[in-house]
């Protein structure tokens, strides 16, 4: 699974100038999970991460490369939850190392979507997440009570890692939080769009998208993402053999 590798490199380049706090993941360090969404009223909130008017990005990238993702860990670029005193820019980026999934395109697509949906099943207490998949944004309202009780990106990140690793295809997970000003959140949002385009292209390939590049509406994605064109023609060849 190398389709997202170039996007991982682009992400790491954007983060290169920062000095993150790093926490290795260990089972048991997760924040309290309520098992369902919690409504945090504005009057009970300390602030919002990625609030309207602030930079925000959210995406998940996959790889089978141990060089790109080599351990379960949480990274934080910027102040932690108890150090924030007002609305701030925010990004949550997840890098997942998965097993080799290149044998069956349809199976690969289903596995990736199942893994990605894990993010919708994490319900940290006092940490109300609102996602906008169309805009690739994530906005979080954090309660004052959660901060008093010790909520942190270390424990929130651990909750996400636990959720992702319930899937046996996930070998290692890195969860990255950004709250510092000065990062190019617009560029991160653009990477999120490209990641979504890769997944959407997989869908179209499975639906029998034309292998004539001159008329294909997704030519730009295949040209930019290494391995996509080979995957596309490989599926087309399999379909031709079946016929």
Indicate residue ranges for each PLM-predicted region.
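N-terminal cysteine/histidine-rich coordination modules
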Residues: 217-218, 238-243
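Long, charged N-terminal interaction/targeting segments
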Residues: 30, 35-174
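Extended non-catalytic scaffold regions that mediate assembly and binding
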Residues: 25-35, 39, 109-112, 140, ...
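Cysteine-cluster motifs in flexible loop/terminal segments that predominantly coordinate metals
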Residues: 191-234
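Long, compositionally biased low-complexity segments enriched in polar/charged residues
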Residues: 3-24, 116, 127, 146-185, ...
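Surface-exposed beta-strand edges and their flanking turn/coil or helix-capping segments
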Residues: 75-77, 228-231, 237-240
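HhH-family (HhH-GPD) DNA N-glycosylase catalytic core used in base-excision repair
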Residues: 1-46, 52, 57-61, 72, ...
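Detector for methionine-enriched segments
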Residues: 1, 29, 128-131, 188, ...
